[in-house]
Amino acid sequence: MTILAEIVKYKQSLLQNGYYQDKLNTLKSVKIQNKKSFINAIEKERKLAIIAEIKSKSPTVNDLPERDLSQQISDYEKYGANAVSILTDEKYFGGSFERLQALTTKTTLPVLCKDFIIDPLQIDVAKQAGASMILLIVNILSDKQLKDLYNYAISQNLEVLVEVHDRHELERVYKVNAKLIGVNNRDLKRFVTNVEHTNTILENKKPNHYYISESGIHDASDVRKILHSGIDGLLIGEALMRCDNLSEFLPQLKMQKVKS
């Protein structure tokens, strides 16, 4: 069983055991009318838009430094991030909906709930906790699930980042006409990354969508490797959580977009 399949099985058990219903019943609703739109930010930006991530660990990384997360969010916004991603999976990534709820009020930037969503109830919890965006991972969803969850999230006034790992999944996303598409550079079987995976997947990309490269981006040289694929932005977690000088590092990543 792959790590991803294991995580999905875990999410199914949480749904069956009432975990998400309990969250919906106990989390106070967070009002996020002041949140900016990430798509609007992309449309206005001549430079790459950055989704800066808050994470504590992952199945492959356990030694991320502890940070003052409120300060981290503040620094992300101060030094040019266009959105913040917050992991809400507790078991594998050390996140929580309570963390999302606490941090979303610290910024006017759009906030992405990054989790493994397979049911509308998870979307309800994300929204109640203060997310303005959600992630849908094509690899773990059927075509019907993808369409239904995407349309439900849009109906809840949430922006949706739809994540693909190969060209076949990209074609599936085009069928639901998702505006915002994430290209994950991680091999789902081995959980290793290759940033140039973005170039391969986007060779024959369609116009009128926005493309975000995710995972494996550690420095400006990685960004230069994929800039000419025509990406509109980056999602970066580990490199930012390890960085002790965001004031220099983050602006270096915001390179001028190259439309291919």
UniProtKB/Swiss-Prot annotation:
Gene Ontology terms, MF aspect: indole-3-glycerol-phosphate synthase activity; phosphoribosylanthranilate isomerase activity
Tree of life domain: Bacteria
UniProt enzyme class: lyase
EC numbers for this chain: 4.1.1.48
Zinc-finger among keywords: no
Database matches in Pfam families: IGPS (PF00218)
PROSITE patterns in the record: IGPS
Pathway field: Amino-acid biosynthesis; L-tryptophan biosynthesis; L-tryptophan from chorismate: step 4/5
Keyword set, alphabetical order: Amino-acid biosynthesis, Aromatic amino acid biosynthesis, Decarboxylase, Lyase, Tryptophan biosynthesis
Catalytic activity: 1-(2-carboxyphenylamino)-1-deoxy-D-ribulose 5-phosphate + H(+) = (1S,2R)-1-C-(indol-3-yl)glycerol 3-phosphate + CO2 + H2O
SUPFAM superfamilies in the cross-refs: Ribulose-phoshate binding barrel
GO BP annotations, alphabetical order: L-tryptophan biosynthetic process
Classification via InterPro entries: Aldolase_TIM (IPR013785), Indole-3-glycerol_P_synth (IPR045186), Indole-3-glycerol_P_synth_dom (IPR013798), Indole-3-GlycerolPSynthase_CS (IPR001468), RibuloseP-bd_barrel (IPR011060)
Keyword match Amino-acid biosynthesis: yes
Family stated for the protein in its record: Belongs to the TrpC family.
Name this polypeptide is given: Indole-3-glycerol phosphate synthase
Species this chain originates from: Staphylococcus aureus (strain bovine RF122 / ET3-1)
